[in-house]
Design a protein with these regions (language model features):
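Secondary-structure transition/capping motifs at alpha-helix termini
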Residues: 27-36, 81-86, 130, 163
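Hydrophobic, well-ordered secondary-structure scaffolds
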Residues: 8-14, 133-134, 157-159
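C-terminal alpha-helical cap of glycosyltransferases
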Residues: 147-163
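Catalytic binding pocket for nucleotide-activated donors in carbohydrate/polymer assembly enzymes
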Residues: 1, 15, 57, 61-144, ...
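Nucleotide-activated donor-binding/catalytic signature segment of Leloir-type glycosyltransferases, i.e.
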Residues: 4-50
Length: 163
């Protein structure tokens, strides 16, 4: 399932990318769909947090691959929503700020399609023990470096500036 809410809809590059994605998803679905199965569920709208958390919790893989991003809270939300008895695997762009913190994720270059394909393959074959080990590392990181610690670190960094 690809959830793709409209973001920056007034930027022509985003409009162009959205058109490419929609065309490609339609092409793939046209080739491989059956009357009772569709390979890509492309949802071009947003969902409330509760529904998103449910999607995240049920998914085997979270694929978060921005070309450029700040912290990227979606990656952290994916980790936080996981069922500890059967967590999914996070595949994360090296260009997301969260990649520095979430060392249990499989880190990929989003421009390298083969690397993403390999990461998906690794994720699907990963043992339950390794999934759990990776998830524990990430959830501990998220719990330790929460908004309060982040804000204290920001204030400390600002106070250390000398003019």
């Amino acid at each position: 399932m690809q959830i793709a809410p409209i973001s920056r809809g007034d930027v022509w590059q985003y409009k162009e990318l959205r058109q490419e994605l929609e065309t490609e998803a339609g092409h793939i679905n046209g080739l491989y769909s059956d009357f009772d199965w569709t390979p890509i569920r492309y949802l071009n709208r947003g969902f409330n947090r509760k529904i998103l958390a449910g999607f995240f919790r049920r998914s085997q893989i979270g694929l978060v691959t921005p070309f450029r991003d700040g912290m990227n809270l979606v990656a952290k939300e994916y980790v936080a929503a996981q069922d500890p008895s059967n967590p999914g695997v996070l595949i994360l762009s090296q260009f997301a700020g969260a990649a520095e913190e979430l060392d249990g994720a499989i880190i990929v270059n989003p421009y390298d399609i083969e690397a993403i394909t390999e990461a998906i393959n690794i994720s699907l074959k990963m043992s339950s023990e390794e999934k759990l080990h990776r998830w524990i590392r990430m959830i501990e990181q998220i719990n330790e470096f929460d908004i309060h610690k982040w804000s204290k670190n920001c204030i400390k960094a600002i106070e250390s500036i000398t003019l």
